[in-house]
Amino acid sequence: MVLIHDAERALDVLIHQPAVDSKRITMIGHSEGTIIAPRVAIDNSTKVKNIIFIGIVAQNLRDILHYQVVYRPAGNATQALDKNHTGLISIQQIAKDPHRYSVLLRFLLPSSVVHTFLRTNNTKVIANFLLNKFANNTIEAGYISIDKQLKPLLIKRYENITAFNLLKCNNLGGCPIWYRSVDTLIPTLSIIGNVSKSTGILILNGENDTQTPVQQAFLLQQRLTDVKHPDHTLITYPNLGHVFYPSSQWETRNGPIQQNVLADLYSWLEAHSGLSHPFVTATTSAIRVKTS
């Protein structure tokens, strides 16, 4: 994978900088970077002192995509939007408040409809598209059936994505060639035992992370325990999302990393890298699981 080679080249350049202490190198990976960081550390065990995983991808890409594309939006529909537990969602309600239904609309609307709505702020374009798309609902007109219509649509979307069609690349945030390159990698969960026992490991994850769910962090923590890695710490943060900003369990909001996360990060680095200017104090509000 090209990004792994790029990271290794960057590490080599960094080590040779006069301002860098080559004996205290820490690899930090966020999201996709958590796939890259341990591989670089394994291949450069004498150079990397610590690894920090932020928003961890522990399993393979298909597991993560299934959570993002099927499990999360279907769960959002069933648990948050279907208030009357009828198994149906009103199309008029969706069109009336598209921001509330934004998690679903990402999967239901083509980009042309989204662009028209953003340009005109006319919710009728949303209602008309959905009414036409789901006109075959024989249970109740004007509604989307979660089990018979929404879930099959999400599964089909997942199957299309995981086909990794190399001929199509319609956006920057996940071209098929990138998906396929990541999909061929052995999951981090299966290689983490190859990290040197002398390498310190910190795992940080928001409990409301909708991109890399917190269960991924628990899986990695358990695996590190199983292989008897002597120095690993897991800290999870209630109500924080993928970028460690307050978020709901269904959608990550963007914003600055919260100060308690930065404080915990610095405190751990101070203890593991000998930082000499402790200008922050670690908080105790996060849920912690530590092994030493």
Question: What are these regions, as identified by a protein language model?
Answer:
Residues M1-H16:
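Alpha/beta-hydrolase active-site loop
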Residues V13-P73:
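Primarily recognizes the serine-hydrolase "nucleophile elbow" in alpha/beta-hydrolase
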Residues I54-N194:
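Accessory cap/linker subdomain of secreted extracellular hydrolases
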Residues N194-I201, P230:
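Short, proline-enriched alpha-helix->beta-strand connector loops that line the catalytic pocket
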Residues I203-N205, D209:
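Short beta-strand/loop motif that positions the catalytic acidic residue
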Residues T210-Q216:
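Conserved alpha/beta-hydrolase "acid-adjacent" motif
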Residues T225-P246:
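Catalytic histidine neighborhood in serine/cysteine hydrolases
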Residues L240-V243, S248-S292:
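Catalytic active-site module of serine/aspartate enzymes centered on a nucleophile-bearing elbow/loop
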